[in-house]
Amino acid sequence: MKTSEIRKKFLDFFASKGHQVVPSSSLIPGNDPTLMFTVAGMVQFKDVFLGFEKRDYTRATTSQKCLRAGGKHNDLENVGYTARHHTFFEMLGNFSFGDYFKRDAITFAWEFLTGEQWLALPKDKLMVTVYATDDEAYDIWHQTVGLPADKIVRIGDNKGAPYASDNFWTMGDTGPCGPCTEIFFDHGPSVAGGPPGSPDEDGDRFMEIWNNVFMQFNRDEAGTLHPLPKPSVDTGMGLERLSTVLQHVKSNYETDALACLVRAAARETGVEYSQDVPSLKVIADHIRACSFMVADGILPSNEGRGYVLRRIARRAIRHGYKLGQKGLFFHKIVADLVAEMGEAYPELREKQAHIEDALRAEEIKFAETLEIGMGLVDSALEGGKTALDGDTIFKLYDTFGFPVDLTADICRERGIHADLEGFERAMEAQRERGRAGSNFKMSGKIAYDGEDTRFHGYDKSSVEAKVLALYKGTDPVDSLSAGDEGIVVLDGTAFYAEGGGQVGDVGEISAAGGIAALFDVADTQKIQGAAFGHKGKLARGALKVGDAVTATIDLHQRQASARNHSATHLLHAALRHVLGGHVVQKGSLVNPERTRFDFAHGEAVTAAQIAELERVVNHVIAANYEVKAELMSMEAAQKSGAMMLFGEKYGDEVRVLTMGDFSAELCGGTHVKRTGDIGLFKIVAEGGVAAGVRRIEAVTGEGALAYIQAQDALIKEAAAALKAQTSDEVLAKIAALQDSAKALEKELAKLKGQLASSAGDSLADAAADINGVKVLAAELPGADNTALRETLDKLKDKLGSAAIVLAAKGDGKVALVAGVTADLTGKLKAGELVNFVAQQVGGKGGGRPDMAQAGGTQPENLDAALNGVQAWVAGKL
């Protein structure tokens, strides 16, 4: 039975038992900031189990995509070396939210596993465990199901504390908990291992395939269990494990869903297909994890989920390198994955090109340093060393992009120790340098426990209000005097407090028409809950708590912010239209001058794409759609398809902003009435802000017109300088200047090469003879990297058995190349030689045993460094 058939049978079975088939949630947990990834089927239902959320069903079933590769849920180092460990896997589950309990959960499981129309597993091949005191579950298995007593094992508190058991589940030290019953498949006596609960239970003979958790109690801080009024059921069954049973194989990687990826890995790395090559299994597992992560909006980066993706991808790439594949290969396996799993998970098909592009870009990035880094490992382990030192591990991490677990993998394969404690010391030293270099101060937080501020700013620019509180800095005061800087809290306001990327409003707060008091508001922020703090300076008069005031915004500034905020929504929708559905917002800043929008995308936006974005947005502006804001329930907003930001906290009621049928987003900001009010939209900048994150800056309305006029003036000024009359003439004259510059640069490079070459010819006579080896360390003034390499090759040919270092200074930097002839690489390594010099001039480098390059930033130390080369070489011979 194919894996896809097993998945379908499971969902069909529980649908026939009244369960709602719920699609898999994202690998990014939407409701649990404590988890980096979705690690189990119950994650998307956590708030339902805790009573914080209600759904219109009480029974559910899912096939949930899961990832375990970060934090305490981390199987990464075992993947590829065991039959069952994975980073990505699918978990089948059925759930009861205060509906059925133990009897139905157990009989459902038994019927699905053994029923002739379902999986029809042999009953004598199954055995179960129950919690030691769970007599109810034991009796259901023994009396209702009819399982013999010798097939039921009671498991007690086997982890050193009350209720610390393989068969007792807890959500934490307190809260929902309960016993569980696990179902095992017996592979037979030909496989090593004993039954659960026995001393040799860790063998492979008895394999757990299904776990039924019974959320029956609430544990208080004293450790006492109290029965829950509505007990629930949470079950999980690994699809890959179940497939091994039904396909009569011993390893998950032999199942149809994974074997096809192992074959694809063999094809792309150029090796023969075999289940005995761990590297092929690593690649097969990791292509699933990486592809699903990218499909769910994660891109490789140096932090958080993006770094986990980078670690997994680079581990796979390194295993390809280990098999001899030095070219790009990993992204080519995405198509095989889509063919296998695209029907069950349509997001793979929809985002295939994006996934391939993201993984290909990561391959290219790592390829730049992989070979050099591996050479550094080889050099560090010369002389039969049994450990890789922490400083080298840190250098691999910091300079060459080797995740620490990847380096640990390499050490494990070679049977040597990885000095991870030394690595941590090097990391801490870097953190200390970072802390010493930083110079920031935390701003104080205001303590406020009064009433909230009512916001009237969607339809009013001025409101009458009462002063609820006043502050100087973070200290509460009864009054402010002329010249005082402070914060004013009102019971009502037209001022928008900074949020959702939009800056706070500015304006004034006045008493008695500004005669009694006039407070200039420079910013508005939420200081506690929904209480708004109006920050500014009292220009005249006095202001006291309890005063009646008028709060009036700067309408011109507000309208400019509104234009830019509405344009941001249009840009977001246009980005998804032009670049693809993978685009998600990563941050924004909206102020009266411009809008700045950060979004997930793996490469620079091209000039043609920017032009298309501008065309699309301005087309919607010209259409003059009405901008509608509507309050609705969160559930209704989700069903409407409105865009919402991952990680943003929303209440039960949300504000949905729509612009025709082009854009719909959850937003609490201020906006124009119609899209035509934006006037004009112009992108002024595009660039990268982090790995996989791009930023676009744009202006609107009068700001866009001013930008275009400034660009026009610049072009006219350039034309005058070039003595050109038309734009065509400007381009022609620029092209002519470029051609002339290229010709001069080419001639200059040729002359430099000739000078360096002639200098190199004369240098051969300066080589010292040390034990029959020619040793030369010299500076070539004016040489570039190409000239250094060409001269090095000539000298190696001319000198025979030789070790050579050549250097050049320029722009406050040092360029270095080192070469060792082939007959000496067993004793001398070019990488070690070049680093000996580079470290003395403030640099580092690497390369092959016969040729290496480096750079430095301390040219004043070059002469001394070169003078030490002869002694260094003599010490190695």
UniProtKB/Swiss-Prot annotation:
Its main location: cytoplasm. Its EC number is 6.1.1.7. Keywords: Aminoacyl-tRNA synthetase, ATP-binding, Cytoplasm, Ligase, Metal-binding, Nucleotide-binding, Protein biosynthesis, RNA-binding, tRNA-binding, Zinc. GO terms for biological process: alanyl-tRNA aminoacylation; negative regulation of DNA-templated transcription. The keyword Transmembrane does not apply. It is an enzyme of class 6 (ligase). Zn(2+) binds at H565, H569, C667, H671. It comes from the Bacteria. CDD domains: AlaRS_core. Its cofactor is Zn(2+). GO terms for molecular function: alanine-tRNA ligase activity; aminoacyl-tRNA deacylase activity; ATP binding; tRNA binding; zinc ion binding. It is found in: Cytoplasm. Belongs to the class-II aminoacyl-tRNA synthetase family. Catalyzes the attachment of alanine to tRNA(Ala) in a two-step reaction: alanine is first activated by ATP to form Ala-AMP and then transferred to the acceptor end of tRNA(Ala). Also edits incorrectly charged Ser-tRNA(Ala) and Gly-tRNA(Ala) via its editing domain. Consists of three domains; the N-terminal catalytic domain, the editing domain and the C-terminal C-Ala domain. The editing domain removes incorrectly charged amino acids, while the C-Ala domain, along with tRNA(Ala), serves as a bridge to cooperatively bring together the editing and aminoacylation centers thus stimulating deacylation of misacylated tRNAs. This is Alanine--tRNA ligase. It comes from Chromobacterium violaceum (strain ATCC 12472 / DSM 30191 / JCM 1249 / CCUG 213 / NBRC 12614 / NCIMB 9131 / NCTC 9757 / MK). The gene is alaS.
